[in-house]
Regions:
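A glycine-rich dinucleotide-binding beta-alpha-beta segment and adjacent secondary-structure elements
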Residues: 7, 216-220, 238, 273, ...
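A short, basic/flexible loop-to-alpha-helix module at the beginning of a structural domain
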Residues: 1-7
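FAD cofactor-binding and catalytic pocket of flavoenzymes
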Residues: 78-106, 112-113, 117-126, 133, ...
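Conserved N-terminal glycine-rich FAD pyrophosphate-binding loop of Rossmann-like flavoproteins
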Residues: 40-65, 96-108
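N-terminal Rossmann-like FAD-binding beta1-loop-alpha1 element of flavoenzymes
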Residues: 9-35
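Residue-level detector of alpha-helix initiation sites
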Residues: 12, 16-17, 193, 197, ...
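Glycine-rich loop(s) and the adjacent beta-strand/alpha-helix scaffold that form part
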Residues: 28, 32-34, 39-56, 249, ...
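Conserved redox-cofactor binding core of oxidoreductases
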Residues: 59-61, 65-76, 85-92, 123-125, ...
Length: 505
């Protein structure tokens, strides 16, 4: 028998970044708010306390902070002609689980969009003509401009205690910042993260080649700081355990370090963990949400009536809940009609790994998730695309996140894969390598979308989300272009000898 709770004003589904921000902003209005999080309760202490959290096997390899994909996953296929199969082993994307969601285990990279990013279809059409856009690319402008969003970008940076160097402050170009960034109203709340030696080498090379290097924008605090909610953050100690880990030092911004301590003060807010939402309920017209139905920690079905329902789970789960609840028109790739599940896109990563001799040392273990030197010269519309044959672009960086022994130990391609020779290669290369990373955009296509799988179901008997996605020629051309640009930086411009390099795509 379904348990029916007392109605509330607002129910929030998913309690990561979006859910906690919505709860905080609404709590001050006096509305009665309930947040439902399907994972467990987690806080900086005791869950992320040192030394527990710096356990690479538990958190980095066994992925303790992530969704249990044995109970719910997505199915994946490349084209509509393929049979989708379940995503059984975490790899490319890592949905979080528990309070804080993916906002706990992220690296803290805190980029604003460029002005062109939000009106890319218009910009591309005006510069190169409508025929420059491939026929299967469903490029669209966003329904808002950068100037409309800037106050909210600014507020979130202040909530996070973000670190970085402004490059365009109220229209004034600032040396040392990103010269391509859109205008910002205020400087970063805290100073940039320190460079590792690899970033220093990259910065020197980039300047000599005519590029414009700058420190990466990060949701990682570099000074003692109290945010607008009255929550104090600590100073980063460069421990090298950001991605896949919670921050024990109160330095990396997360819901736990920036919002939840202030939110706890409101009696009109309630958080229920281990509450797995199955669907959004609607009235008889099918046009008005009336609440949600979820399974509680004791396995009971519960109905929570609410005047307002906010879906703030991981993006894949929001789409699935809309489809399961029959809200909105599902996207149809054959006709182009519908919006739910349309325009699924991802990102493309690559880079060059550089190995040096014993005279050049890199202490990668002193790192953060977002420190490093970057260039934006080949990002978005910051360069002329007329002769390159693709839309989009990349940031290029010397960005080191740590020197952890299991996941972040690298050897040259020529090294043995096991045994004494492998051990020697580890000793020879651990402190004598660096990488140049490339993070690239991916455009939307009519054949890349999300819908419900007709075969596979989750532990509650509901269809899994099906992902149809593959790399397209536009992105493959971009990757080859960026490989050439990146490898051109790996030259004698570096003052120290480079033994080998390898392109990783």
């Amino acid at each position: 028998m379904t348990i029916k709770k007392e109605p509330v004003d607002v129910v929030i589904v998913g309690f990561g970044w979006a859910g906690s921000l919505m709860a905080m902003e609404l709590a001050s209005t006096g509305l009665k708010i309930v947040a439902l999080e399907r994972g467990e309760q987690r806080d900086t202490y005791p869950d992320f306390a040192y030394p527990r959290i710096v356990d690479e096997l538990t958190y980095g390899v066994r992925l303790k902070l992530f969704q249990n994909i044995s109970k719910e996953s997505v199915t994946v296929r490349h084209t509509t002609k393929d049979t989708a199969l379940p995503y059984r082993r975490m790899g490319s994307f890592l949905p979080g689980d528990g309070v804080g969601g993916a906002g706990v285990h992220w690296n803290g990279l805190l980029w604003r969009p460029l002005e062109a990013d939000l009106r890319l279809k218009t910009v591309v059409t005006e510069k190169y003509g409508a025929s420059f856009i491939p026929g299967d690319m469903t490029l669209q402008d966003y329904p808002f401009t950068y100037s409309e969003m800037e106050p909210y970008f600014d507020k979130f940076e202040r909530i996070c205690g973000a670190s970085g160097q402004a490059g365009n402050l109220n229209g004034e170009r600032i040396d040392g910042g990103n010269p391509f960034e859109a205008q910002r109203a205020n400087p970063f709340p805290t100073k940039p993260l320190l460079y590792q030696y690899s970033a220093m080498l990259f910065e020197k090379t980039a300047k000599e080649m005519g590029y414009n290097p700058f420190p990466g924008p990060a949701a990682i605090c570099t000074e003692a700081y109290t945010n607008p909610y009255g929550v104090a953050l600590g100073v980063c100690n460069y421990c090298g355990f950001c991605e896949k880990f919670g921050c024990y030092n109160y330095s990396k911004a997360s819901p736990q370090t920036t919002i939840i301590p202030a939110l706890r003060q409101y009696d009109n807010f309630e958080l229920r963990c281990k509450s797995h939402v199955l669907r959004v309920n609607k009235d008889s017209s099918g046009k008005l949400a009336t609440g949600v139905t979820y399974i509680d920690e004791n396995g009971r079905e519960v109905e929570q009536p609410a005047s307002v329902v906010i879906l703030s789970a991981f993006q894949l789960h929001n789409v699935r809940l809309l489809l399961l609840s029959k809200i909105g028109q599902p996207y149809n790739p054959e006709t182009g009609e519908g919006v739910v599940g349309k325009n699924y896109a991802y990102q493309m990563l690559g880079g060059a790994k550089l190995f040096f001799n014993e005279k050049t040392w890199f202490n990668h273990f002193a790192a953060t998730g977002a420190s490093g030197a970057y260039i934006d010269n080949y990002n978005s519309e910051n360069f002329d695309h007329a002769g390159v044959g693709f839309i989009g672009g990349s940031t290029v960086s010397a960005h080191v996140t740590g020197g952890r022994p299991i996941e972040q130990t690298v050897t040259p391609k020529s090294a043995p894969k096991w045994g004494t020779g492998w051990k020697k290669a580890i000793r020879d290369s651990y402190l004598h390598n660096m990488s140049i990373g490339v993070s690239s955009s991916v455009m939307p296509y009519k054949q890349c979308y999300l819908d419900l799988d007709p075969t596979y179901k989750d532990g509650y008997g509901l269809p899994l989300l099906r992902m149809t996605f593959d790399w397209q020629q536009n992105e493959l051309r971009m990757t080859q272009f960026m490989a050439g640009k990146t490898e051109s930086m790996v030259t004698p411009v570096f003052a120290t000898p480079i033994l080998t390099t390898s392109w990783l795509a």
